[in-house]
Amino acid sequence: MTGVQYSLSGLVAVPLPPAEALLLFTPRGEERWVRGWRPRFPMPSDDDCAPGTVFETDTHGERTTWIVVDRQEGRRVCYARVTPGSRAGTVTVTVTDDTRGGSTAEVVYDLTALSPQGARELRGFADGYADHLRSWQVAIAEHLSAPEAMTPG
């Protein structure tokens, strides 16, 4: 047993209405602003956030399998994720109106280490979580300010 589990939560400001902001946190939506994010779908799907949708990513030398567990259209999406032999858990993004024409996305990672190496990876992720979310906010803002950027959808 590794005995390492974290529940990490933080906020990301998005200068879009909630329904549009949530699209940036879908598998294909993240491709627009996350460098190196290339989800692969074993079964083609027009709706990449339909519950039961499975996709894989390869980042930082690791393959992770993701499954859309639940979604509340235009408001929330929840993914289960497993990096074999390393970490497993859920990621939930809930978007609310910030009353200024934009949105606030609450990003919650509930992760458990599956190995000693996974425990080290997870501790490092937890230590840098606030900076990680700040980098997301910057990347989203840069994406949305680019001349060729279109709102998601």
Task: List each model region and its residues.
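Glycine-rich portal/gate segments that line the openings of hydrophobic small-molecule binding cavities
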Residues: 29-33, 40-84, 90, 139-143, ...
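A short, structured loop/turn motif at beta-sheet edges
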Residues: 15-19, 69-74, 94-104
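A generic alpha-helix structural signal
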Residues: 22-25, 126, 137
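Short acidic, gly/pro-rich beta-turn/loop elements at beta-sheet edges
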Residues: 20-22, 33, 67, 89, ...
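Beta-strand/loop substructures that line and gate deep hydrophobic ligand-binding cavities in soluble
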Residues: 82-135, 142, 152
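Hydrophobic ligand-binding cavity/cleft-lining segments
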Residues: 1-47
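Intrinsic-disorder/low-complexity, polar/charged segments enriched in Ser/Thr/Lys/Arg/Asp/Glu/Gln
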Residues: 5-13, 54, 63, 76, ...
